[in-house]
């Protein structure tokens, strides 16, 4: 039984997963912050990413959608420092990471999605004065442990 308790173990465990497994896990990480999404396209992107049978053509299509949503969210953030919009931007980045092809990003899709999800929660923390990012990190450890133990 695997129990992830720190970022070192978290990253090592992620590196041991194949790309398809990382995509499925990345989708779970994004699902945990979906309430912070500010673009409706993200839900469809993650629905596709979460399917084990998602084909390359479909993944490419939703990657374009995720990138467009990320750009739109980034534009909405503006110079005002709207932390809710910042959170939405990071959710879009996490969704983009989940469907990015193999070898195109440092650390793989699950790592990038996890870090962007934490950034989304950091933005929420600034807006609400709660420790949302710390809770997200622990939730990710649990999601990964459950994922590994179910295999």
Task: Report residues per predicted region.
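Structured binding/interaction patches within domain cores
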Residues: 1-151
């Amino acid at each position: 039984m695997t129990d992830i308790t720190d970022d070192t173990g978290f990253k090592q465990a992620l590196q041991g997963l194949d790309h398809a497994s990382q995509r499925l896990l990345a989708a779970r990480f994004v699902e945990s912050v979906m309430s912070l999404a500010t673009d409706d396209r993200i839900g469809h992107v993650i629905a596709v990413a979460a399917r084990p049978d998602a084909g390359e053509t479909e993944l490419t299509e939703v990657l374009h959608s995720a990138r467009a949503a990320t750009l739109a969210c980034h534009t909405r953030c503006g110079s005002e420092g709207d932390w809710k919009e910042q959170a939405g931007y990071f959710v879009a980045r996490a969704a983009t990471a989940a469907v990015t092809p193999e070898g195109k990003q440092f650390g793989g899709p699950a790592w990038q999605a996890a870090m962007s999800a934490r950034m989304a929660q950091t933005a929420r923390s600034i807006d609400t004065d709660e420790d949302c990012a710390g809770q997200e990190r622990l939730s990710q450890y649990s999601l990964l442990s459950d994922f590994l133990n179910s295999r």
